[in-house]
A protein has these predicted regions:
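A short His-aromatic
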Residues: 121-122
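A short glycine-rich, Lys/Arg-flanked "PGG" loop and its adjoining helix->strand segment in the class I
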Residues: 127-139
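Class I SAM-dependent methyltransferase SAM/SAH-binding core
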Residues: 49-51, 55-103
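A conserved beta-strand element that flanks and buttresses the S-adenosyl-L-methionine
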Residues: 115
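Short alpha-helix
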Residues: 173-188
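Conserved Class I S-adenosyl-L-methionine
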Residues: 55, 192-260
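Conserved class I S-adenosyl-L-methionine
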Residues: 1-43, 57-61, 78-81, 89, 144-166, ...
């Protein structure tokens, strides 16, 4: 039997977990949305393309303060949720459609800002996708990526890569910060600003935002138990206000497409 490729794994996984992902506290976090909106320097006249928009929450947030927000995602269920949420919110200046990030269904130079938020760790065709983001962006428009990034310590990073793949089978790999910086430079996009922040993620909340088999759940619990006995790994976990959290670095970058 032919094994599904990464793209099909991502599509099927997000179709299965669309409602869970949409309801996740991180997806709904208005403080995170406001921070990223301001980081991207969005303004009333902007037209936004959100590549791999998920359930459309950030598009809907932005649409209240810009000209128009467009979201595209590989998952049918995610797009259905995005349309439903926009309608229920009474936000008319949004458009959502199913599409593939490696071949975006838009004309060249259609949007003033093109972003990919919390999605690059599901990709493998980084250069193709970034080229498509750049193609769809105005000349002198902005291009932004926001995503989790690799840990500096190899032992720690190896642990969390295995952890992420057990949590969600659609996880490919968290890119390094240097890889993302190189991506901008190799595609001749000027870097305007960058920021790396460490956030504390609620472990139980994080585990519940994705779906997995009972077998994988047991494996994940055993894997975490082993990791928490490691003198290095355990430092990335902590109890806070009766909940268990783990540390994850997030990198945000904003660039500008050249005028020619």
């Amino acid at each position: 039997m032919k094994q599904p490729n990464l793209k099909e794994i991502v599509r099927l996984q997000f179709n299965r977990q669309a409602q869970k992902f949409s309801s996740w506290s991180v997806t709904k976090n208005q403080e995170y949305a406001d921070y990223y909106f301001n980081f991207c320097e969005m303004a009333p006249g902007d037209t936004l393309l959100d590549v791999s928009c998920g359930s459309g929450d950030f598009c809907i947030f932005c649409a209240q303060n810009i000209g128009h927000a467009t979201g595209v995602d590989l998952s049918d269920k995610m797009i259905d949720l995005a349309k439903q949420q926009a309608m229920e919110s009474g936000i008319a200046n949004t458009t959502f459609r199913r599409g593939d990030a490696v071949s975006l269904p838009y004309e060249a130079e259609t949007f003033s800002i093109v972003i990919s938020k919390s999605a690059f760790h599901h990709y493998s065709d980084y250069h193709t996708i970034f080229s498509e983001m750049k193609r769809c962006c105005y000349r002198q428009g902005r291009i932004s990526i926001q995503d989790i990034v690799a840990y500096d310590d190899k032992e720690v990073n190896d642990f969390f890569e295995s952890f992420e793949q057990l949590v969600d089978t659609s996880h490919k790999v968290a890119c390094s910060k240097s890889f993302i910086l190189d991506l901008y430079q190799q595609h001749n996009v000027d870097i305007l600003s960058t920021m790396e922040i460490t956030i504390d993620l609620n472990l139980n909340d994080y585990l519940n935002h994705a779906v997995r088999s009972d077998k994988d759940t047991v494996h994940l619990e055993q894997f975490l138990e082993t990791g928490l006995k490691d003198d290095v790994i355990k430092n990335y976990f902590q109890y806070k206000e009766k909940d268990f959290f783990f540390k994850r670095n997030v990198f945000v970058i904003l660039g500008q497409k050249k005028s020619r």
